[in-house]
Amino acid sequence: YVSNRKQTQSSDMVLADCGAEYQNYTADITRTFPINGKYTPEQRIIYNIVLEAQDSGIVASRAGNAFKDPHKRAMEVVQKRLMELEIIKKPEEAKWYFNHGTSHYLGLDVHDAGTGTALKPNSVITVEPGVYIPEGSPCNKKWWNIGVRIEDDILITEGDPINLSVRVPRKAEDIERLMESKTMP
């Protein structure tokens, strides 16, 4: 929903893509949370698919891997899971619902330049898969109007990637617990 002309309903979710700038360097993260503090069963399923896709993309965020490797890994998860749910019939149909890249570099611009090279130590990328199922999609109506994106900032190292935004809750149950407590940890 992008028109921004209607009041949110209790069963809606909000996708918040937020950023900051510090000493001319930028960063952004995204979370998707339920207005009423609890994901519906269908929202939770899609949320967990996106989280699994993000985890897979983060694992692929290693020095020497291609910039597109996190996207390939995330897309594989989305394809498999949406087929299992019969939301899509063929893997290539996942592009209907996951229709953007998974990563961008962070630096002097929030969407810093670069896509074609191998990932290098000390660079920072985002890993931000998303699944967005609009009303009227050729799937069961229970999936309509669910959109989820989860974005974190990942430091490429000589070893394992480091999630720089790890303190911001990512799991559905952690977000629900945070919303119930109404305080930040």
Where would I find each of the regions flagged by the language model?
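Active-site neighborhoods and metal-handling regions in enzymes and metal-associated proteins
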Residues: Y1-P185
